[in-house]
A protein has these predicted regions:
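Conserved Rossmann-like nucleotide-cofactor binding loop
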Residues: 31
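Basic, alpha-helical nucleic-acid-binding regions used in initiation and control of genome expression
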Residues: 36
Length: 207
């Protein structure tokens, strides 16, 4: 929309927002400032006026619209990486919680010690966060539809994956724990073996 009054541009932005749209506005002039300021995302050009830059959220230093596409791609990829880490983290905690809780009701030796859980939280979570944060942007995210406004970061498919993988891991680990108890009880070697399998399952979950 060009060659229009500033209030007309702002009115167009407001009408789109009332329809539930997330509006991004680009502009470089002073008359674009009201629309840039009112939009959810205001993008000004690096060669634009200082008024437009102050009213916007992002300034395109190279004045290239291609930079907008790149920014959207990286933003969506970063969001998916955060979702992957949350799913990985909650799967670990869900598995550990049920294994320790059910193991206590079974009357067995504590299958996961406090030191082991501290190691998992410090070592595995740190390296998992670094690995997921360093994933390159995926161009395929541009084929996805925009997310609804206010959508929770943990979606239904993520909850399904957490419960599905977590339950499978719990069943496997409890079966292993029960076999150890039947064959003579858990000693320090069995405890180490159990913890090793727990860590390997989480590495498989990360991959």
């Amino acid at each position: 929309m060009s060659r229009a009054r500033p209030l007309d541009k702002q009115r167009l932005v407001k009408l789109l927002q009332t329809e539930g749209e997330v509006v991004a506005v680009t502009g470089d002039g002073t008359n674009d400032a009201p629309a840039l300021n009112f939009a959810q995302v205001g993008l000004s050009m690096g060669s634009g006026t200082s008024v437009a830059k102050e009213a916007s959220d992002i300034t395109l230093l190279d004045d290239s619209f291609r930079s907008i596409v790149t920014a959207v791609m990286w933003g969506r990829s970063l969001y998916k990486n955060i979702q992957r880490f949350v799913m990985f983290q909650l799967t670990i905690n869900f598995t550990a919680l049920l294994v320790v809780l059910i193991g206590a009701f079974m009357g067995t030796t504590l299958p996961l010690t406090v030191t082991q859980m501290l190691w998992v939280n410090i070592i595995m979570d740190t390296f998992a966060a670094l690995a997921l944060a360093s994933l390159p942007a995926d161009p395929n995210v541009m084929n996805e539809k925009p997310r609804p406004v206010g959508q929770f970061i943990i979606t239904r498919p993520i909850w399904t994956s957490i419960l599905g993988y977590g339950t499978a891991f719990v069943v496997f680990l409890l079966a292993m724990l029960l076999r150890i108890e039947i064959t003579g009880g858990m000693d320090v070697y069995d405890l180490t073996l159990f913890f090793t399998f727990f860590v390997l399952l989480q590495f498989w979950n990360l991959l």
